[in-house]
Amino acid sequence: MSRIGKLPIEIPKGVKISYIDSNLMVEGPKGSLGRRIMSGVSIDLTDNTITVSRDNDGIKSRSAHGLTRTLINNMVTGVTTGFETALEINGVGYRAELKGDVLNLSLGYSHPINFQLPKGINVEVDKMTKLLVKGIDKELVGQTAAKIRAFRGPEPYKGKGVKYANETILRKAGKTGKK
């Protein structure tokens, strides 16, 4: 039995869940999310809990059991509280600016980077060097933050680039030089 998969998911007030033909829809105060549930896993909806169980003990069913439970829990959390990831931009002249749903990044290249934000993702820019990526889909929030970071990842000598707010950069010493 999966240690994560066997835990029931509490459904908060204001969240509606519908499960039809292996499609799960979760609606809440922040929006709605849908996902197709993998084969080999079944879902039991009771009054205010969701229980995930597997049909057999095959390798596919065992691996999908805990994953399905975690994905459903992330959907419920997303439509109630949402998810956010903080990014920091370090470097002279490095800045971010939001125009509509396009994030303009100036990261030391000869050209500005215009990043089109996906639907369902909001970005808040604070002092042109701090970004807060918000949304209800945890996977999409993390993926968007990773794409923004990938434009100019932090370098180990001066720490310039885009990094996660809680990320520590291992710094290297430069060349000592010949005297």
UniProtKB/Swiss-Prot annotation:
Transmembrane portions of the chain: none
The UniProt record lists the keyword Transport: no
Keyword Cytoplasm: no
GO molecular function, one term: rRNA binding
Keywords: Ribonucleoprotein, Ribosomal protein, RNA-binding, rRNA-binding
Coiled coil start-end: none
PROSITE patterns on file: RIBOSOMAL_L6_1 (PS00525)
GO biological process per UniProt: cytoplasmic translation
Subunit description: Part of the 50S ribosomal subunit.
Role: This protein binds to the 23S rRNA, and is important in its secondary structure. It is located near the subunit interface in the base of the L7/L12 stalk, and near the tRNA binding site of the peptidyltransferase center.
Family to which this protein belongs: Belongs to the universal ribosomal protein uL6 family.
Protein known as: Large ribosomal subunit protein uL6
Organism: Geotalea uraniireducens (strain Rf4)
Name of the coding gene: rplF
